[in-house]
Amino acid sequence: MRIIPAIDIIEGKCVRLSKGDYDTKIIYNENPLEVAKSFEAYGIEYLHLVDLDGAKSSKIVNYKILEQIATQTSLKIDFGGGLKSDDDLRIAFESGANQITGGSIAVKNRTIFEKWISEYGSEKIILGADAKDEKIAVSGWLEESNEDLVPFIQDYQNKGIQYVICTDIAKDGMLQGPSFDLYSKILAEAKGVKLIASGGISTFDELPKLAELGCEGTIIGKAIYEGRITLKQLENYIIG
């Protein structure tokens, strides 16, 4: 299972929020590149990089940080947050993203998101399915939609999506453990999906459980920054 640490960016700094609420922001490091290099030093290969300024302003903002991390580490980066236009996407890939995650755009502008899937392919485009009570949430989680989570994922599988990052918003940044039941349900009903679990990871022991369920990967944020899971533990897990 892929281990994917997260770096969330506000005003160029590495932060974490609780339940996606911008008022709860804690700054963990002024230098995201340093954080990324520390991940790489422990054998980590993947990075989930979120432009929270972008998510709020509906256009790419922190692409310079993406570029720095992409040029100065060999991490495979999936980048998300506010990608709304062909231009945003071009900038993200030109700045060094290996994959991009589309969340709000997949709800609010299906035409453009489906075009991206067909143009760039399913290895490059990840569906961000962020849910609250099994309804999809959009715009940095500030709005709920009427889309039901599992049918939404299935619909995009039919359009060619393979990778799905699913965040249970109620769990995100709360360090109370991930939504095992929700992920079991998705894996049972959206057959063949490459599911990346996100939100709530709080202890190392949860990782083998997510792997057992069949998750393709897991995104870990606050648990690393708060020292609940150490980079050494992750290194040992990756080495196997």
UniProtKB/Swiss-Prot annotation:
Root EC class: isomerase
One GO molecular-function entry: 1-(5-phosphoribosyl)-5-[(5-phosphoribosylamino)methylideneamino]imidazole-4-carboxamide isomerase activity
Keyword Amino-acid biosynthesis among UniProt keywords: yes
Catalytic residues of the enzyme: 8, 130
UniProt-listed InterPro entries: Aldolase_TIM, His_biosynth, HisA_bact_arch, Isoase_HisA-like, Isoase_HisA-like_bact, RibuloseP-bd_barrel
EC number of this enzyme: 5.3.1.16
Sorted UniProt keywords: Amino-acid biosynthesis, Cytoplasm, Histidine biosynthesis, Isomerase
The keyword Ligase belongs to this UniProt entry's keyword annotation: no
Catalytic activity: 1-(5-phospho-beta-D-ribosyl)-5-[(5-phospho-beta-D-ribosylamino)methylideneamino]imidazole-4-carboxamide = 5-[(5-phospho-1-deoxy-D-ribulos-1-ylimino)methylamino]-1-(5-phospho-beta-D-ribosyl)imidazole-4-carboxamide
Protein known as: 1-(5-phosphoribosyl)-5-[(5-phosphoribosylamino)methylideneamino] imidazole-4-carboxamide isomerase
UniProt lineage: Bacteria, Pseudomonadati, Bacteroidota, Flavobacteriia, Flavobacteriales
